[in-house]
UniProtKB/Swiss-Prot annotation:
Any one GO cellular component localisation term in the record: respiratory chain complex III
Organism: Alces alces cameloides
Gene that encodes the chain: MT-CYB
Function: Component of the ubiquinol-cytochrome c reductase complex (complex III or cytochrome b-c1 complex) that is part of the mitochondrial respiratory chain. The b-c1 complex mediates electron transfer from ubiquinol to cytochrome c. Contributes to the generation of a proton gradient across the mitochondrial membrane that is then used for ATP synthesis.
Similarity-based family: Belongs to the cytochrome b family.
Classification of source organism: Eukaryota, Metazoa, Chordata, Craniata, Vertebrata
The protein, known as: Cytochrome b
Cofactor info, note text: Binds 2 heme b groups non-covalently.
Amino acid sequence: MTNIRKTHPLMKIVNNAFIDLPAPSNISSWWNFGSLLGVCLILQILTGLFLAMHYTSDTMTAFSSVTHICRDVNYGWIIRYMHANGASMFFICLFMHVGRGLYYGSYTFLETWNIGVILLFTVMATAFVGYVLPWGQMSFWGATVITNLLSAIPYIGTNLVEWIWGGFSVDKATLTRFFAFHFILPFIIAALAMVHLLFLHETGSNNPTGIPSDADKIPFHPYYTIKDILGALLLTLFLMLLVLFSPDLLGDPDNYTPANPLNTPPHIKPEWYFLFAYAILRSIPNKLGGVLALVSSILILILMPLLHTSKQRSMMFRPFSQCLFWILVADLLTLTWIGGQPVEYPFITIGQLASILYFLIILVLMPVTSTIENNLLKW
C-alpha cells in the first residue's frame, strides 16, 4: 500500500515541502530563521485575534480598551505583551534572515529574493499600522509624522495624505482603517510566504559554501524538523523572558499617555526596528530627499543581485567582503542608536556619516571589493 502522505493531494504538498524535501546536509543555524518567521507569524495572528475580540477601533475608547485588556480580561496582559514583543522577535528574525541572505549570496534566487523584499515591506507596513492602534501619544504622533511624509510627493502629495487620513488630520477614520489594514495584512503576508516557499523549493536551499549541493542532500524530516523545533523553543524562551520580566523594555513610555493632538511629545520616534530607516530619513535636511533615502534604504535590497560582481556566491571564502559585511552591520546598529537620539550635535553629523557609509558600502565598496577578490584568485 502506498503511503497516504505521498498520494493524498493535500498531504502530498505538505510532504514535498516539510518531510521528503531534499535539503543540503551542511546548512547552519542561520537557516533556522525562515521557520522562526513562520512561528512568529502564527503567534502574531493568534495573539492578534484574541486582542481583536476585546479591542475597539474608536478614538474615544481605543486606549481604554487596551487598558481593559490588560486589567480585566483573563490573561489579557500576557496576550497583549506577547503580541507587542512578538513583533520585536519577528523583526529580529527578519533582520537575521535578510543578513544571512546577503552574507551567503542567497539573493541569486531572484524570485525568492524579490518576494522576500516585498514581504519585508508588508511586515513593516503591518507593524506601523499596528503601532497606531493603542492610541497613545507615540501612536498618534508617529502616525501623523510618518503619513505626512507622503505629502513630499510632488503634485499629488497633499491629496494622498488626506485620502489616507480620511480627513484633514489623523482621527477616527484613520484609526478605523488602520485597524482594518492591521487585520488583513498578516493574511496577505501568510499567502506571500507560501509563494516565497514555492519559489525556494523550485531551486532548493542555498548552503554556507554557496556551492551546489545536489550531490549531498538529506531529507528535511527528521534532521531539520528537530533543528527547527529547537530553534522555535529557544525563540519562545527568549520571547517569554522578555514578556514576563521586562515587557516594556522595547516600548516607549509616551505610549502610556492617551493621544492628545494638542500636546506634541519632545522626541517623536518609532519602535526600535524602524530606527535605522528613521535615522536615514532625518539625516537629509530636505523632505522629499529624506523620503527617497528612506525608501531606497530598503529598496536597495532589490539591487543586490545586480551588484554581485564576485565569481563566488557566498562570502565564506571572501575575507575582505566579510569585513565589509560586518562594518555594514555595525553601521546599521549605529543608525539604530542615532534614530533614537534627539536631533542635535553630534548626533546629526554621526547620522549623516552613517547614512552615507550605508549606501557607499552597498553600492560601491562591496562590488569593488568583490572584483579585487576575483583578481586575487588569479595569483
